[in-house]
Amino acid sequence: MKKSINEIADFLGGKVVGDGGILIKAVRGIDEAGPGDITFVANPQYEKKLNETGASAVLVTRDTERPGENVTLIQVDDPYVSLGKLLTIFYPEEREKPGISAQAIVEEGAEISPSATVYPGVYISSGAGIGAGVVLYPGVFVGRDAVIGENSILYPNVCVYRRCLIGKRVILHAGAVVGSDGFGFANPGRDNIKIPQIGIVQIDDDVEIGANTTIDRATLGRTWIQRGVKIDNLVQIAHNVVIGEKSIIVSQVGISGSTRLGRSVILGGQAGLVGHLQIGDFAMVGAQSGVHEDVPANSVVSGSPCQPHRNWLRSMSCLPRLPDMRHLLNDLRKRIETLEKLSEMKKEVEKEKESSREKEETK
């Protein structure tokens, strides 16, 4: 497929600065792009590469100026969003052929839409419901009475346990596990007694969950991933957690039981949250933060234990200077000790002088 820069700009609602007649055949990164390619610059720190790229066209912000005659710009509101739209044109998704493979196992009582695609090695349990346009790749397991909503995609080796509910247009990447038992144990004395986990996981529409992420079923009730949430790879979500609409959870985050996230919360990579917390709407938690208390709405916290982000920045700015500060402190301590000794010696001398005067006066 080839499209002119003018055609691309019209599609994106952008403005061409340069030669709009050049034909574009591919979309590539700014370092790899060559003649006939289009790339993008969404981060200001990469604007210097506009002079270096071999691309024929670059998606840029509205206020970016053309660096020279060698590259044509398409000015848009958001280059990254425009890139996403452009990729759907140059690299459209292939439509899966509907049907159930003879090598899939479907128990009696399962309901599967005729427009669903079920690959070899899929296991669908009794009472499960598979909606229209769903794609189940090899190795997927769908438990008893689980529901997979319309146009959802479950990549290889995804496991959806019994009675869990998956909404429409949900994407579960390879190895994701939905509905494994919550980590619920009572330990009277030194015994660990398992508490049955009889709740479910509910995943609402338009959620995407990364590879090898695990979401535990609730002890009672539901673990709930609300509409539009995006979860990265290797995330652990414990029993009865609620993640509010359009929140973003980055890789290796761990969320303990019964913690509730509000709307549009962002958790940075490797953040850890203890249980039974309330994280307010639009809050942001920095990478590797240890969250031990509630986080108010619209706040930004970082560090372990977490604290307001600005306080954490001030603390971190001191760390590189700690060795020098330690040497300075030791030097000051020695000076103070020396001054104290001199002061004591001075006092002794004064005492001796005073004693000598008294003796002279008594004579």
Curated annotation (Swiss-Prot):
It comes from the Bacteria. This is UDP-3-O-acylglucosamine N-acyltransferase. Transmembrane segments: none annotated. One of its GO terms (cellular component) is membrane. Belongs to the transferase hexapeptide repeat family. LpxD subfamily. Keywords: Acyltransferase, Lipid A biosynthesis, Lipid biosynthesis, Lipid metabolism, Repeat, Transferase. It is an enzyme of class 2 (transferase). Pathway: Bacterial outer membrane biogenesis; LPS lipid A biosynthesis. Its EC number is 2.3.1.191. One of its GO terms (molecular function) is N-acyltransferase activity. It comes from Syntrophus aciditrophicus (strain SB). Catalyzes the N-acylation of UDP-3-O-acylglucosamine using 3-hydroxyacyl-ACP as the acyl donor. Is involved in the biosynthesis of lipid A, a phosphorylated glycolipid that anchors the lipopolysaccharide to the outer membrane of the cell. Residues 342-363 are annotated as: Disordered. InterPro entries: Hexapep, Hexapep_transf_CS, LpxD, Trimer_LpxA-like_sf, UDP_GlcNAc_AcTrfase_non-rep.
